[in-house]
Regions:
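Catalytic cores and adjacent binding grooves of peptidoglycan-active enzymes
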Residues: 6-7, 11-13, 96-156
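Extracytoplasmic cell-surface/polysaccharide-interacting catalytic and binding patches
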Residues: 1-71, 146-151, 155-156
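Intrinsically disordered, low-complexity segments enriched in small/polar residues
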Residues: 3, 47, 91, 129-134
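Generic detector of short, locally flexible boundary/turn motifs and exposed helical patches
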Residues: 42-45, 72-76, 107-110
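Extended, low-complexity, intrinsically disordered C-terminal regulatory tails
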Residues: 62-93
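Glycine-rich, flexible loop/turn motifs
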Residues: 31-34, 87, 96
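A short linear-motif detector with a strong N-terminal bias
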Residues: 56-58, 85-89, 113-114, 119-123
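N-terminal start-of-chain detector that recognizes signal peptides
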Residues: 50-51, 77-83, 113-117
Length: 156
């Protein structure tokens, strides 16, 4: 390790991190039959029925949230799951948002975050599972959209 300043160190040979590296892949179901804590309605587009995006969330994505829910033992409230393009624009989402089911399934959710203890527990469990995490004041965004840059964390 090379010291770079007061209490800071860097590793010249950085390790390439990949999401899912610590997750047994056989745990991810391809349908909703093994999902304990969520149902598809929680991830439906919130555009008041103007679109037909009612069952477009990836079950493999939801399985990761289910594993987190089981691990932290706390309820997880979905603020936003799948979005149609129209609703995504209305809420100020990115043009190429993982919330929109571009390839048939969406791969993103915004999770209500009531306090810092929940934030800590959720992030600790989510880091090995998701390569894309956004942190807002009262929500956490997670997605596993393989078409977007990986191993990134941002703040809103």
């Amino acid at each position: 390790m090379k010291k770079t300043g007061k209490n800071h160190q860097t590793n010249r040979n950085r390790v390439r991190l990949t999401p899912d590296s610590a997750v047994p892949q056989e745990a991810a179901p391809s349908d909703w039959s093994q999902i304990k804590h969520f149902n598809p309605r929680e991830f439906t587009c919130k555009c008041d029925g103007l679109c037909d995006h009612t069952d477009c969330i990836s079950p493999e994505f939801v399985a990761k949230l289910d594993m987190i829910r089981e691990q932290i033992g706390l309820p997880i409230t979905i603020v936003s799951g799948t979005r149609c393009e129209r609703h995504n624009r209305k809420v100020g989402g990115k043009e190429r948002s993982a919330h929109v089911p571009w390839t048939g399934a969406s791969h993103a959710a915004d999770i209500r975050c009531a306090d810092s203890m929940f934030r800590f527990a959720f992030l600790t469990a989510a880091l090995p599972l998701f390569g894309r995490i956004g942190i807002g004041k009262d929500f956490i965004h997670v997605d596993d959209d393989a078409d977007l840059p990986q191993c990134v964390i941002w703040v809103y």
